[in-house]
Amino acid sequence: MKKFIFAAALSLTTLSLNAQTTEEDKDYLPDGTFTVEWRFNPFSYESKPVNVAQLNGRLFINETSAVRLGIGVGFNTDKDEQKQNINSQSVNANNYDIGNSLTTIKNTSLTLKVGAGYEYHFANTGRLDFYGGGEVGYLGRFYSATKTINATSTNVLTISGTTTKTQIADTESYDYSNSNADRDKFTEHGIFGTVFTGIDFYIYRKLYVGAELGLTVNAGTTSNASWTRNKTHRSVVGANETENWTESFSSETGITNYVDNLNNNNNRQSADYATDSSDSFIKVYVEPAIRIGWMF
């Protein structure tokens, strides 16, 4: 009889503890609360929407429904320098250049993403909360670049056994608007739609971490990109300049201006076709995210 009473008491105690644990775990789950979270994409790939991070806010209407608003900003700059030797002696031994050049390329990109969506929280087990939903919004990518080429060389000219050496300095600078230096990426404006599913794990009553996986369709247009080139050539024999001219070109107008800095009578202008890089696009990609948030 004593053993039976002890076993019954132990069973009641266990059930009581289990019930308390369940109630405590339920307290971790949101109910009509507001959360703020920081999310980032841990992977790197070409169509990655936001390169840095995104800030999301969620408002829980009830235990199963939440609306959310997110703002993401990404910024990236890369710089590349290329050194090259100049030697055209093998082409013409009587008139060749020898020297070196340095090319510096700097690409800059900015990404802006703004979206609003709905979440349906369909299951929870203690501290784990599972959800799915959809989101729509604006996604823009902005590109710009600069390229500078500095070359110094010596022209070696031999005529009838007489050799003349001339110092030459060339500088070229390019400014790219709405594209990168290779002109294979152009500024984009578009809308996106995402269906997603995710999970939250509540570490403490107001702190959670989570993961999300979405399938995104992005549609929009690319902007008409343009670039300008300024080229200065200086040819110096001793202390005297024999050439000093500047050439400028704009792809937006298709006009090239040639300015002779030593003799303005040689100035001239030529016209070419203006370029147009505007186009429409549709992209589909998978978008993973790691999240950490706080409940208010």
Ranges and model annotations:
Residues G32, P49-A53, T108-V114, L128, ...:
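Residues that define the transmembrane beta-barrel architecture of outer-membrane proteins
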Residues Y204-F296:
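Predominantly the C-terminal beta-signal and adjacent terminal strand-loop region
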